[in-house]
């Protein structure tokens, strides 16, 4: 039950953020959107390091000087996995006019939702891996550390939910449809978490690889999508400052509560 509630927390964050479209009249300003994206990127980088890569290396400590190997391999598989999805799935990033991936007749709205869904996959996997480790009795992963990651992902999902629902509204969608689009973009997280838990419980020795896999996938999203988004438009340091704020928040949560 504890794990079930934990994997739902990030989805609730997305839903809360998407609900902004129901009470806000105007679309997000460019500066506000860059600030929100910067914050989300900071949280994801900190989570990748403190909650995923470091535990992956600690779990491999019996390997001695080769303790880095599972984290190294898993990290690169995660990067290549997202790179493959990036080329195989048609999607359109918020604020961009150029679609990515194979040519398609899908509408702008659908491709915008697919873009956010694409980068929610590693977040769901990250939460799933943490809870799989906790359920398996891993010494490095506690209920508190798994909950901290869920809370961190949920916090950064709030601005992400708004970032997808508000542009959908600006594209001409009704408030209800824009809200639904924001919510649907996050539904992949609990699904990914459950599937990862089911897979990880069958291959517990692979947990260091799975943890670093999720980290690699998340960092790919940050560099490929979020950093360019927070740098769009006139020069401003707001995205960078909020990146540092997001990183600090997640680091404090992980160290103080995990």
Could you tell me what each predicted segment is?
Residues 1-258:
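Intrinsically disordered, metal-sensing/regulatory segments
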